[in-house]
Amino acid sequence: TDLLLADNFSRAAQSCNLKHIVYVGGILPKDNLNISKHLLSRFEVEKVLGSRNTPVTAVRAGIIIGPGGSSFRIVTNLVKNLPVMACPKWTKSKNQPIDLRVALKSIHQIIGNKNYYNNPIEIGGSEVVTYMDILKITAREMEKKRWIFSIPFFSLGMSKLWVGLFSGSNSNFVSPLIESLRHDMTLNSKVIVKDLPDYSIKETIKRALDKNIKIPTVPTGLAQTKDKNTVRSVQRISNPSKKTA
């Protein structure tokens, strides 16, 4: 579905002479040979969006933390509901979370800037932390006394069940997120966005928890339009010999 939507968008962008596509995805891990399906799908979407004439900038971001964020809501719900957290191996994976304000400013600088055309850009905070670190900092900022410790094994199925049950999040959202968090996702790219503010992870989490910040409403649907009844598919076909046709 992601590939088909990306292909439709790419076609529409070319048809409408769109000047620039900015696609926000996630940082890709260094161990590309064992990449999760979720992260591989993001990379494939990048390629499909860039398969035509419209310039594309793929913004690969660390965990974006801000008020109302879906990923951070999982963290706050776990801290709220679990006085004891036995954290599996994937919670020790390294990441560089980025403040929502910094992510938005990055996108603002990138849009329409030819220096970033057809280049992947990685953005993240200056601090390298683990998911367990984020849980602990969040617990302190929420003033919740929590016993958070690691266990030396990784059970993907149990992790999905545990996080989904106690975070109140849909399994379709939790499952790919857990799969991708087994990777270390730190910045690799040398192409950076300059002159950005830098907030500590503590400052970022504290602001994300601020209930006085008004969160913009998100549209729940679009007006129905009558489209032509066309059928199209995007196929994954391996090309081991790297031929062009």
What is each PLM-predicted segment?
Residues L5, S70-S71, W90-G112, N118-N119:
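Substrate-positioning beta->alpha
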Residues T1-I21, S36-S51:
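NAD(P)-cofactor binding segment of oxidoreductase domains
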Residues G25, K47-G68, I74-N77, N81, ...:
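Conserved beta-loop-beta element that borders a ligand/cofactor-binding pocket
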Residues L39, F43-E46, F72-R73, M132, ...:
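Short, surface-exposed alpha-helical segments at coil->helix boundaries
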